[in-house]
Amino acid sequence: MVSSFTSAPRSGFYYFAQGWKLVSQPGIRRFVILPLLVNILLMGGAFWWLFTQLDVWIPTLMSYVPDWLQWLSYLLWPLAVISVLLVFGYFFSTIANWIAAPFNGLLAEQLEARLTGATPPDTGIFGIMKDVPRIMKREWQKFAWYLPRAIVLLILYFIPGIGQTVAPVLWFLFSAWMLAIQYCDYPFDNHKVPFKEMRTALRTRKITNMQFGALTSLFTMIPLLNLFIMPVAVCGATAMWVDCYRDKHAMWR
């Protein structure tokens, strides 16, 4: 099936919505099952545990609020909850993506072939197994780029005043960009585009990618919906690749 997508610029919101449509297409659903199972098991268990701990963590986080900001505690408390959800959600979605990376790459490859009519390289379970070391190396590159920046932002949470006001906003923007990188990287990596070159390409459409990443980040925090977000985001990012980046970076056509 040749894609009905056009090369006209679209918003990140559009591609996120496309992900929900594409994930259930005939011929694609079977490639969704394994990433979906990984996400349901890990994110479901993780968020269940998180909600049993919030009544301990939130008061601890609020204890860093200085006395002169106590009058804003009714506004800062929701920000503290959102902060915990953002950090926790991104952390566990990163773990889930590490585990499911080979299957996410296969999903992106098969969806791209369906959208464009192109013939992908010969794949299958043996092809996936052979590619696992390269895929894990790529995941490590993303993690090594992300970790020092995340540590700096996490330190901000322990600075009175800043940690309860500015830090949550900065973390949300950072997680939006990182999730755009995480999911857009699957189709890029399928075409062996280097990690640095991929980031440069995404910056040419930074607003679109920030919109896509922001919605992905928000849905990662919502119980039940976050169980399905991984394959949806892979499909949305692949649709964006087909429209915006494939003509310049594709290795197979």
UniProtKB/Swiss-Prot annotation:
Location of the protein in the cell: Cell inner membrane
UniProt-listed InterPro entries: CysZ_sulfate_transptr, Sulfate_CysZ
GO CC field: plasma membrane
All ranges on the Periplasmic side of the membrane: 52-74, 172-221
GO molecular function, a single term: high-affinity sulfate:proton symporter activity
Stretches in topological domain Cytoplasmic: 1-30, 96-150, 243-253
Regulation of its function: Inhibited by sulfite.
Predominant place of localization: membrane
Transmembrane segments: 31-51, 75-95, 151-171, 222-242
Keywords per UniProt: Amino-acid biosynthesis, Cell inner membrane, Cell membrane, Cysteine biosynthesis, Membrane, Sulfate transport, Transmembrane, Transmembrane helix, Transport
Membrane topology reported for the UniProt record: Multi-pass membrane protein
One GO biological process term: sulfate transmembrane transport
Domain of life: Bacteria
Role: High affinity, high specificity proton-dependent sulfate transporter, which mediates sulfate uptake. Provides the sulfur source for the cysteine synthesis pathway. Does not transport thiosulfate.
PANTHER family, per the entry: SULFATE TRANSPORTER CYSZ
Family membership: Belongs to the CysZ family.
Full protein name: Sulfate transporter CysZ
Lineage: Bacteria, Pseudomonadati, Pseudomonadota, Gammaproteobacteria, Enterobacterales
UniProt gene name: cysZ
